């Protein structure tokens, strides 16, 4: 259970503009929670809700 999330690990949760859930899928915005990608990564910007800055992002792989 993620302390920042209202659901069990791997489950679903709702999120606002910023996401604190690490292992959850957001249901309200239909996007995964992940780290922000560097500028220029349109794929991550469109498919993720940022929870923090990072040089590497699973959505950009």
UniProtKB/Swiss-Prot annotation:
GO terms for biological process: cellular response to cadmium ion; cellular response to copper ion; cellular response to zinc ion; detoxification of copper ion; intracellular zinc ion homeostasis; negative regulation of growth. Gene3D superfamilies: Metallothionein Isoform II (4.10.10.10). A divalent metal cation 1 binds at residues 5, 7, 21, 24. A divalent metal cation 6 binds at residues 37, 41, 44, 60. A divalent metal cation 7 binds at residues 50, 57, 59-60. GO terms for cellular component: cytoplasm; nucleus. A divalent metal cation 2 binds at residues 7, 13, 15, 26. Residues 30-61 are annotated as: Alpha. InterPro entries: Metalthion_dom_sf (IPR017854), Metalthion_dom_sf_vert (IPR023587), Metalthion_vert (IPR000006), Metalthion_vert_metal_BS (IPR018064). A divalent metal cation 5 binds at residues 34, 36-37, 50. Belongs to the metallothionein superfamily. Type 1 family. Metallothioneins have a high content of cysteine residues that bind various heavy metals; these proteins are transcriptionally regulated by both heavy metals and glucocorticoids. This is Metallothionein-1L.
């Amino acid at each position: 259970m993620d302390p920042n999330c209202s659901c069990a690990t791997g489950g679903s949760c709702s999120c606002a503009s910023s996401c604190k859930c690490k292992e959850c899928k957001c249901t309200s915005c239909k996007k995964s929670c992940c780290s922000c990608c560097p500028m220029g990564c349109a794929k991550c910007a469109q498919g993720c809700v940022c929870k923090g800055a990072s040089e590497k992002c699973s959505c950009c792989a």
